[in-house]
Amino acid sequence: MQPMVMQGCPYTLPRCHDWQAADQFHHSSSLRSTCPHPQVRAAVTSPAPPQDGAGVPCLSLKLLNGSVGASGPLEPPAMNLCWNEIKKKSHNLRARLEAFSDHSGKLQLPLQEIIDWLSQKDEELSAQLPLQGDVALVQQEKETHAAFMEEVKSRGPYIYSVLESAQAFLSQHPFEELEEPHSESKDTSPKQRIQNLSRFVWKQATVASELWEKLTARCVDQHRHIERTLEQLLEIQGAMEELSTTLSQAEGVRATWEPIGDLFIDSLPEHIQAIKLFKEEFSPMKDGVKLVNDLAHQLAISDVHLSMENSQALEQINVRWKQLQASVSERLKQLQDAHRDFGPGSQHFLSSSVQVPWERAISPNKVPYYINHQAQTTCWDHPKMTELYQTLADLNNIKFSAYRTAMKLRRVQKALRLDLVTLTTALEIFNEHDLQASEHVMDVVEVIHCLTALYERLEEERGILVNVPLCVDMSLNWLLNVFDSGRSGKMRALSFKTGIACLCGTEVKEKLQYLFSQVANSGSQCDQRHLGVLLHEAIQVPRQLGEVAAFGGSNVEPSVRSCFRFSTGKPVIEASQFLEWVNLEPQSMVWLAVLHRVTIAEQVKHQTKCSICRQCPIKGFRYRSLKQFNVDICQTCFLTGRASKGNKLHYPIMEYYTPTTSSENMRDFATTLKNKFRSKHYFSKHPQRGYLPVQSVLEADYSETPASSPMWPHADTHSRIEHFASRLAEMESQNCSFFNDSLSPDDSIDEDQYLLRHSSPITDREPAFGQQAPCSVATESKGELQKILAHLEDENRILQGELRRLKWQHEEAAEAPSLADGSTEAATDHRNEELLAEARILRQHKSRLETRMQILEDHNKQLESQLQRLRELLLQPPTESDGSGSAGSSLASSPQQSEGSHPREKGQTTPDTEAADDVGSKSQDVSLCLEDIMEKLRHAFPSVRSSDVTANTLLAS
C-alpha cells in the first residue's frame, strides 16, 4: 500500500493586489472628504463590495476619478447616476458579507468532523498494539490492519477536498496576527469578524492536517512492523521445528549408550573417539539454539512477546540442549577417567600392589597414598616400603657410614629389583619416553609409564617373573621420597635418571660416565654449575637415608672445587678428568663405589677363618690386618666394631671383596713385615683415609641447585642434626681429642681414622702369578723379584695418591681462613665485629657440646646393649658351647674349660675370652666416663636438656 501524502496548503496567504487597491481607494476617499461636493463624498464613502472575491471593481472609480479630474464638478444627471451605482454596490456588498458568513460556517463543521474521526482512528490504531507472538494471530492482525488502512485510504479524498476548501477560503480571506491582545468591544467591525473567522478556520485546518499526516505515517510504520514480526516468527517457528528434530535424533543416539561398567577396557579409546565425533556432528545445534534465542530477544525488544505455546517450546529446546551437552560432557569425562584409571597407562593396575586392609588411593596431583582401613590411618609410604625402612634400622650397628649407607642401598636395590636392570636397558626406556632433556619436569604418570616399561622389558630380557605392580609402586615411592619429599607430584628428568642409574646393576664407571653426559654440553665438557647440579642430585640418595652428614653434607660446592682441580685452571672439566677424580673416591661420592664393592662381595667366599668369630669360610668382605700376621676379620665383625685385644682398628687394614691371589698375599706379607717395625705413634701421626676427603667449609651454598620440594615440618630438625654432624666431623678432622680421651679406640673409630685399602681385581691382581701357591713362589726367585717389584710399584702409586691428598688438604685448609678474613673485612665497626665473633664462637661451642652430648648418649645406649648381650652370653650353660667354633661359644667358655679341651694352649688365655674381658672392662670404664661427662654437660647447659631429648626422640624415630 502506498502511503497517502497530503499537499501542504499555505494557511497564511499574502494579500492580493485587489485587496491593496481597495485600501488605496479607501485612503483616497478619506482625502477627498474635504471636497465641497457632497455627492462625490457620498460616492467615495460607500464603496461597492468586491465581486466574487476579486476585490472592488475599479472601473467605476476610475471613470469617476477621470470625469472629476477631466471636467471638474459633475453635472446633476451624472451625479444621480453615480449615486445610484453606489447604492447598488452597497447592496451587493451587504449580500457578499452575508454569503461570507454562511460559507465559513460550512467549513467549520467538516473540519471538526475530520478532527474527531482522525482522533478516533488513531486510538483504534494504538489499540492494535502490542502484537501477539504467534504466527496465526499476527496474520490475523495483518488482515485487520489492511482493512483499517483501506478505510483510512477511502476517507482521504474527502479530507483532501475539505482541506483544499479551507485553503481556498484562507487564500481569499487572509488574516493578520494579533500584535497585542485587547478586549473585544461589543460592536466589532466586519473586518475584525472576518479576521477571527479566518483564524479559527486556519487552526482547525492545521490540526486536521497534522492528525492526517500522523495517522498515515503510523499506518505505514505499523504495517512494516507487522510484516517484520511475521517474518521473525516464521523463522523462529521453522528453526524450532528443525532443532526439535535434531535433538530427537541426538537423544536417540544417547539412548543407545552402554553403561561404562559394561565396556571392555580395550574398547575405551574407540568409545572416546566416537563421543568426540558425536560432539562435533551436533555442534551446529549450538548456533541454531543461539539464533532462536537471539530472535526471541529481538522480538522482546520490539514489545512482541512469544505466546505461551511458543515460549514453552523454546524453553523445552533450551533445556533439552543443555541436558544433551551435559550428558555428552559427562560421558566423555567418564570414558576418559575410566581409560586413565583402567587403561594401559593408568594406575589402576597398581592397586594390586597392596593387600587387605590396605588400599591404594590417588591424590589430586596423581601422587599415590595408602589407606589402612583397619587402623583408619593414611600414609605416603607403601606398606612394603615401611617394612623395608624398618629392616634398614637393623644396619645402624654398622659403625662406618659409607658401608652403612651402601648396605642400606643394597637392600633397597634388591627390594626394587633394580639390581637386575642394566644401564643399557634403562637408556632404551629413557629414549623411548623422550627423556633426553634433563631439564624436563616429569609428573607421576610419566614416571609410572617409564617404570612400567622398564620392568616389562626386564621380564622379556631376563625371562623371569617380576611383580610389576609392586616393583613400580615401590620404585615410585622411593623416587618420591628421595627427590619429591613434599609430594608435589613433579620431579626433574635428571633426578629420575640419576636415581635409576645409581641403583641399576652396572659398573660404577659406566654409571658415572652416563651421569656426566647428562650435564655435559655438546663438547662433552661440564662447567661448575652443571656439575653442582649433578652432585646435588646424587647426594639426595644418602640424604634420604639420613647419612648425608658423613659425605660432606648438602653443600656440594667443596666437592665441585675439589673436582675442578683436575681441570688445570679451565672453567670446564672433561669426562676423563671427572672420572679420574671419582676414581679417588671423593667423600661425596664414595658411597657409590662402596655399593659396587658390596654387590660384588656378596657372592665371594674366602677360604680363611675370622680371627674374632671363627667363621670359616669368610663370606663377603675380608679384612686383613697389615700390622699382625695371619689376622683376618669377616665383614660382620669388622663393620660392627668387634675386635680382639691385639687387632685394633686404627692399624692399617686391607679390604678384599674378591678371592685373594698369591701376589696379593706376598704383597700384604711384605707390608705387614714393614709395619711391624713401626710404632703406634707413627700410625697416629700419619692418619690415612680410605677416600678422598673434601674440606667442608661453613659457607653459603652459592652453587645453583634445583629448587627442592616443600619439606615436612620435621625437615628443619633434620637439617639442624645434619648441620651439627657436619661441624662435629670438621672438629674431629682438626685433631679433636675429646673422643680419644673419653672413648677407647675401638669405640670412637670411624672410617676416616684408619687406613682401609681395598684390593681391586683389576688393578691389584697379577694374572701371570694369580694361580701359584705361596710355596711355589718362594722357590722361584725370579717370580719373587717380580712380585716385590709390583709391590713396590703399588706402594709408590699409593704414596703418590696420599701425597696428592695431603696437598689438597693443605690448600683447602688455607682457603678456609681466607673466607673468614673476607667476611671480617666487610665489617665497618671493629667493636661490633668482635662482639659478633665472640657470640659466634660461643654459639659454635654450645652447638659442639650439644652434638657431643647427643652422640655420647647414643654411644652409651650402644654400650649398654653390648654389655647386656655379653651378660647373656656369659650366663649360658657350658654344655651349649662344647665343640663350637662360633663367637658365642667362645665367649661362653671359661678359661678352665679352654684348658681342658685344648691342652696345647695350657697357660695361655684364649683370644676370645681375652677379648670378652677386654670389652667388658673397657665398657665399664667408658660408661663411667660417659656418666661423668654427661653430668658435667647437664650442669653446664641445663637449658638445652629439653631440646636434646626432643632431638634424640627424632633420631630414634
Swiss-Prot record:
Keywords in alphabetical order: Cell membrane, Cell projection, Membrane, Metal-binding, Phosphoprotein, Repeat, Synapse, Zinc, Zinc-finger
A Pfam match: EF-hand_2
Cellular compartments annotated: Postsynaptic density; Cell projection, Dendrite; Perikaryon; Cell membrane
Residue intervals of the WW domain: 358-383
Residues that bind Zn(2+): 610, 613, 634, 637
Segments for region (Disordered): 877-923
Intervals holding Spectrin repeats: 102-179, 231-337
Gene: DRP2
CC annotations in GO: dendrite; glutamatergic synapse; perikaryon; plasma membrane; postsynaptic density
Modified residues (Phosphothreonine): 910
InterPro entries for the chain: Dystrophin-related_2, EF-hand-dom_pair, EF-hand_dom_typ1, EF-hand_dom_typ2, KCMF1/Dystrophin, Spectrin/alpha-actinin, Spectrin_repeat, WW_dom
Protein name per the record: Dystrophin-related protein 2
Subunit description: Interacts with PRX; this enhances phosphorylation. Identified in a dystroglycan complex that contains at least PRX, DRP2, UTRN, DMD and DAG1.
Zinc finger (ZZ-type): 605-661
GO molecular-function term, one example from the UniProt record: zinc ion binding
Compositional bias ranges of the Low complexity kind: 877-900
Function statement: Required for normal myelination and for normal organization of the cytoplasm and the formation of Cajal bands in myelinating Schwann cells. Required for normal PRX location at appositions between the abaxonal surface of the myelin sheath and the Schwann cell plasma membrane. Possibly involved in membrane-cytoskeleton interactions of the central nervous system.
Gene3D superfamilies: 1.20.58.60, 2.20.70.10, 3.30.60.90, EF-hand
CDD domains per UniProt: EFh_DRP-2, SPEC, WW, ZZ_dystrophin
Primary localization class, coarse: other
